[in-house]
């Protein structure tokens, strides 16, 4: 099964039922891929979803993720520090490397630097491209 890492903004935009990216959330729920997360990522998901939507929905979304059998939980023991423009984004990179994820799904421009780093290789897909693979 595919293992992917999803950045927080992509999680946020895929949740509404009218979102063109809702297919990404639905694909996770039916087991089309495994969502790979770390403690740091879960904390960020909860924080940002609470601020942007509301705390109750944030708790429900995170609880759904954590209780899913399609979850890959990892504790990255090494911090690669590959993204320097927004060091908070490194939590997603470290998770992807530690679990051997197929890709990070992100629309964040800070992740583009990863294309120029040969090792460790980390593939990044924007959410539209990833959504097209979920059909």
Task: Locate each region found by the language model.
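PIN/NYN-family metal-dependent endoribonuclease catalytic core
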Residues: 6, 20-50
């Amino acid at each position: 099964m595919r293992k992917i890492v999803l950045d927080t903004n992509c999680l946020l935009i895929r949740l509404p039922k009218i979102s063109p990216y809702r297919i990404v959330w639905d694909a996770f729920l039916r087991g089309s891929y495994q969502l790979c997360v770390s403690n740091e990522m879960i904390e960020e998901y909860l924080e940002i979803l609470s601020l942007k939507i509301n705390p109750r929905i944030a708790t429900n979304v995170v609880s759904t993720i954590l209780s899913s059998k399609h979850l890959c939980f990892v504790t990255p023991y090494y911090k690669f520090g590959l993204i320097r423009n927004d060091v908070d984004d490194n939590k997603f990179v470290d998770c992807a490397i530690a679990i051997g994820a197929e890709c990070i799904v992100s629309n964040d421009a800070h992740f583009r630097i990863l294309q120029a780093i040969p090792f460790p290789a980390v593939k990044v897909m924007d959410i539209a491209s990833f959504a097209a693979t979920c059909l």
